[in-house]
Amino acid sequence: MTDPPRPDPFPVTRLDSDAGALFVLQSKGEWWHAGFHLTTAIVGPTILTLPYAFRGLGWWLGFVCLTTMGLVTFYAYYLMSKVLDHCEKSGRRHIRFRELAADVLGSGLMFYVVIFIQTAINTGIGIGAILLAGQCLDIMYSSLFPQGTLKLYEFIAMVTVVMMVLSQLPSFHSLRHINCASLLLSLGYTFLVVGACINLGLSKNAPKREYSLEHSDSGKVFSAFTSISIIAAIFGNGILPEIQATLAPPATGKMLKGLLLCYSVIFFTFYSAAISGYWVFGNNSSSNILKNLMPDEGPTLAPIVVIGLAVIFVLLQLFAIGLVYSQVAYEIMEKKSADTTKGIFSKRNLVPRLILRTLYMAFCGFMAAMLPFFGDINAVVGAFGFIPLDFVLPMLLYNMTYKPTRRSFTYWINMTIMVVFTCAGLMGAFSSIRKLVLDANKFKLFSSEVVD
């Protein structure tokens, strides 16, 4: 006997008066557009951190963790897309992570838990994208004008102004061409960096390689869990329901194609960057492999043209990443500020959009300039945020929706993943906080030096 239909707490009819849904999360996209959005959300300059993550794990454990994270996140995103498809077929199409979690878990509290975690992640990534883009400009400026007087916060201000302009693109769907370019840019700088690493590794100027781990057992454990948190954060996105919302209904089956496109790019970029960077620099790998290729002292270890192009590609992609992760904030603001009876470009809706999005980007830019040690803070946010949203909730939502029997293989796989990654997330958070405390004496507000 089937259960009686439940009343929908977020019925589709409400979307007619929901400006966040109608304007920001327009459902017009095809599966390849979802692939572009997913790739931009996951495949970013953070992949240049993978050799550094391998430094805390070593070769075989690094491969195991990278492969496991890839398989688990693909599985998790696939399960979440199935839950969204199931809800859509039941007449309850959800376009927001927070509403999906609250509906399936039957808890209004989950609505606020998810929105808090999403806001922390998305704002953190927005700040990080502006900071890294400012660093890219700083690197190019320092190369061209070694005695130049401009400071990092001035480059951050320049990036923020550009982001203010780009933020006026009204909807997630309107980013599809930018995110297609972002996919190509990620392939471009990966190809350049991997080529530079291989060329260096085969040359007579190759650095001495050492692949040993920390000497103490406690150091090995903390380094390993910090590396696991880094890899988990790199694979995370936390906005899959919002990306699936951009698909023209019915969205059933389209998200799987988008995931396959995204993970094809992931396979090429993640493994090639991790292997080539760690092979050449070993346990001297920096948190950004470009820093290894451009040491503070001594000659550059790759052709200037190659590094310059890679930095430009990274800079351009960071604009796309900042835009993608700001969409949830825009959707929340527009839901409250816009009028659905007026056009998307009407004066009534254009003026609030211009003011609110500009203020949001100004806040992100100010925080990036004030906190150039944000990498350490972001590691903590990643451990507390990405692991719950991307490694725990999808499995829980699937078990609650499809109710597999407790004897089934699927049930126990999902439970195992939830338990293992909850423990890994707690250990990773502890390790990240430990690193934050250890680096505290290096922190300076509005500094031109970024803490590694």
From Swiss-Prot:
Keywords linked to the UniProt accession: Amino-acid transport, Cell membrane, Membrane, Phosphoprotein, Transmembrane, Transmembrane helix, Transport
UniProt subcellular location: Cell membrane
Residue stretches spanning the membrane: 34-54, 56-76, 113-133, 152-172, 182-202, 221-241, 261-281, 304-324, 354-374, 377-397, 409-429
Modified residues (Phosphoserine): S17
GO cellular component assignments: plasma membrane
One Gene Ontology term from the biological process aspect of the record: amino acid transport
InterPro entries to which the protein is assigned, alphabetical: AA_transpt_TM
Primary site of residence: membrane
Membrane topology: Multi-pass membrane protein
Function per UniProt: May be involved in the transport of GABA.
Protein family per UniProt: Belongs to the amino acid/polyamine transporter 2 family. Amino acid/auxin permease (AAAP) (TC 2.A.18.2) subfamily.
Protein name, per record: Probable GABA transporter 2
